[in-house]
Amino acid sequence: MSNGLRTSFERISLFHPQGFISESSAEFCCSAPSNLSPKFPMDHWERTSSFSPRCRHPDLRVRLQSSPPRGPQSDRNLPSLQPLELHGDRPGLCDVHETLQVQKIGLRQSKLLRTSKLPSHRGRFRSIPLHLHLSSEVRNRFHARCPDVLQPLSDTRPLHSVPLSSEAPLQSSCSPRKLLHRPLSPPKPLHLHNFRQHSSLCSRRSPCRKLRPTPRCNQLAQAQQHPLPSSKPLSLQAGILGPCPLPPHNKRSPSPAVIRKTAGILPHPKLPPSSRGHLPSSTSSSSPRSNRGVRCSVHLHKSRSNSQDLRSCRVRSNSLQQTPILMGHFKSLGQSPNLRSFERPRPTRRSLRLLPLSPQKVPTVHVPTHQQSGHKGPSLPRPHSPSRQTHHARLPHSKRVSLPNSVLHHDRPKRPIHFGSFPINVAPSHLLPRKLWSRASSPPTCSPTTSNHGHPEEALRFLPKNLPQHCQMALMENYCSHFSSPSSSVSFPEDHQSSLPPISTRWVQCSSPSFSLQSFLVIGDIPCPISFPLSSPQSHSSESLRGDSPPSSHLPSSPSSACSGDSFASCSSFGPSNPTSSASALGGNHFNFSFFS
């Protein structure tokens, strides 16, 4: 450097203590200019320069570093290598004139910047002019960095006293700042446009009513026992990219499309049969936790032997029923496993209706007449049900027989029934001697050529055990005569038809179960009064319809009951409470009859 101080040394100087360079370094002294002092201080450990700023030069450096400082050091506190400063006057340093100009630029840059003033605030700080006279109190309130800004004054004003009221205020759920800055205002009605003034413009529109908003009220304290329904969490709400694909928890309600099919369910009959080629025949039972995860696709590798472990969780054991389920057919899940037959409820007391049968469809029963000269044909001494329809009873066998058309509701019978009391001097039939009973009605024997249906032993199965012997004989006679001579018809004597006055037909109803009905049977020339209590229809309605026991078991075993041996109608007096008791004596045939009085 031509116009500067030469700093190139031929050899490195030795170590010297801090502060000065030794005089023994003759080589350094010889190479140095003559105007330099032989002893000049080095950089101090506190980084304070002892040289004048005008003698500094960046190229004038000592290649020997100073000793480490006594204080603690760090990476940021290393001793800097300051350039050497020269002593002497300025005219003797003509070679370092450029060094002074460089130093001036460094001093301008190294000047510390002043601290910036804090901005003045209307509510917190108050600025005052400096030319005003300030008292000692005001001087103490000066800001530390801003002398023209005063510190805030303490507000010593008294607080407003709030009168205490007896009523406790309502507890609000929002913060108190919102209540202070949000004054409550009374609701204002919302006025809409009056369409009635312009009715021609909108004639078909109905007039609008005046809407008023709901008055706003403070929210009361929430009860802990009845909390309000929690809102939807923030994680489940829809954002910019839309709602989340899956909820964060696993406890979610299963969708109706994913329904597990149980074993043993029949496939839907309307669906076509599925193919079985692309699905395996059977799979291993999966764990119950496999259905909770996400369904995986089917990846089958032909080269691997354990390809069954890579099947999807939706592949079921029955491959025929798997395809409709994967295609989304909800009806293919089958029907209910409850395949029991429908059980019809048992009929109630009033649900069984006995309808009449037309005489054209039902064959007529031909009962042979075995009457003597003085025998009178009795009628059926039993009451009728409240309904005015003719009763017919369905018995176990399939045959149907009915009484002649003259006995039905079209023609009046030749011998009607009279309900009432007869003279006491008439002897009942059970008090007559055996000889008189045999003379009055001698029961004929059954024909030996009768079939198995007309056998007397078959009729005994349907008769109660507590009947008298003469009643059993009369029932057997009528049963055998029905199959022995089917061509005969029922005939009634006409001697009583002219003697009895014409009486209109009436129906007798059983109002109470304790009502006793007294009738009579004509045995020969002696009318025999019989009396028996009428039982309520509730006592036998359930048992007679079930068919658990023969209906003839409900016949009353009264010693005063008597029966004639001429016709089938005389045997029905033993069952006044059961409409099927008289018909069950013929082995379960179907009868149709009506009663007149």
From Swiss-Prot:
UniProt family annotation: Belongs to the tymoviridae protein p69 family.
Ranges of Low complexity composition bias in the record: 273-291, 535-574
Location of region: Disordered: 62-82, 160-198, 218-315, 329-411, 535-586
The protein's name: 66 kDa protein
Amino acid composition bias (Polar residues), ranges on this chain: 64-80, 218-234, 305-315, 575-584
Domain of life assignment: Viruses
Species this protein is from: Ononis yellow mosaic virus
InterPro entries membership: 45/70kDa_tymovirus (IPR004935)
Residue ranges, compositional bias (Basic residues): 389-400
